Amino acid sequence: MLRAIFYKEWLKTRWYYLVAVLLSLSFVGYVLLNFFRAAGLKGIAHLWEVMLLRDAVFVDLLQFVPLVVGLLFAVVQFVPEMQRKCLKLTLHLPCPELRMIGAMLLYGGLLLGGLFAVSLGVLFVAFRAVLAPELVRHILLTAAPWYAAGIAAYLLAAWICLEPTWRRRLLYGAVAACVLRLFFLAPAPEAYDGFLPWLTLCTLCTASWSWWSVVRFKEGRQD
């Protein structure tokens, strides 16, 4: 059954996911292109100096890319479920409802997690060729909360999309905005080092919120 659910979700999201992969990696490529162009013009030693003295990370352009990718993934995956009344049929399949919704969220989380891991992996390989391990770690730890925000945005947007009433959607949207703001409160590089485990836990906890919306949907709540 899990394979069937994954296949159903893949049919809905495959084209968006392809576009998301291309755009995400294009942004990563653009960041690296700018970095190596600057290295060619001014020398890699100058960039080392800038990173050490000015706390630069050279990946600021990526800050909101995972957030947008995760948000739109949830919209593409769950809005058709609500508009076409497919969720009611999905919940009547011979599979526990909680497991069904969990599988749908797991599908999205795995695809986004894979994309974000590849993006960070490309950054690691490219920067590791010319920078010290400590500087590479500095860059990746600075970017890590942004990618965690992408997963959180996906889970929170799913929670909102599955909610059957517009009044609650607006309320949930305000709550989601406050939660996502936590990932961008501190602009300084590596500002979240000590808080990163708590951000990860917060992200995982939001996965359960969609079940509240599904329960309300089953109860027939509507505007």
Which stretches of residues belong to each language-model region?
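Hydrophobic alpha-helical transmembrane segments
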Residues: 1-64, 76, 80-81, 162, ...
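Alpha-helical transmembrane segments of multi-pass membrane proteins
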Residues: 7, 11-15, 19, 98-115
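Secretory targeting signals
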Residues: 24, 28-32, 36-39, 43-70, ...
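Helix-loop-helix units of permease transmembrane domains in multi-pass membrane transporters
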Residues: 77-107
